């Protein structure tokens, strides 16, 4: 996928040292549901780390060829995009943004980029 999607938005391959950031993105996607449970912060943190680890291992097993990319805005990491290409299709595995970057069109730009790339090689996106 193109590493430059729109002004100020870019992608780069995720590295091992991105794990703390990727955890923060993941945890931010679970905050609303965790606000509903009667757990203290330590319990929530334990749960989030366990779930992040399970998701990471599950994605690695199910999609070993997937590209995990860090979404950048003005050079700063703001989210994660994971896409798995196969010979006959492209699977949009996951897209997640930090809360302050949601609902401003960034996700739309990213999904459109995935769709455009798939169309350019004649593959459907699922």
Give residue spans per PLM region.
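A short, internal acetyl-CoA/4′-phosphopantetheine-binding micro-motif in the GNAT/acyltransferase core
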Residues: 95-103
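A short beta-loop-alpha structural element at the N-terminal edge
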Residues: 10-24, 30-36
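Conserved GNAT acetyl-CoA-binding A-motif
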Residues: 89, 118-126
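Conserved G/P- and acidic residue-centered "switch" motifs that form tight phosphate/ATP-binding loops
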Residues: 18, 75, 105
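Conserved GNAT-fold acetyl-CoA-binding loop/helix
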Residues: 30-58
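Conserved acetyl-CoA-binding loop-helix of GNAT-fold acetyltransferases
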Residues: 103-116
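Glycine-rich phosphate/pyrophosphate-binding loop shared by adenosine-nucleotide-utilizing enzymes
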Residues: 9, 76-80, 90
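Conserved beta-hairpin
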Residues: 67-84
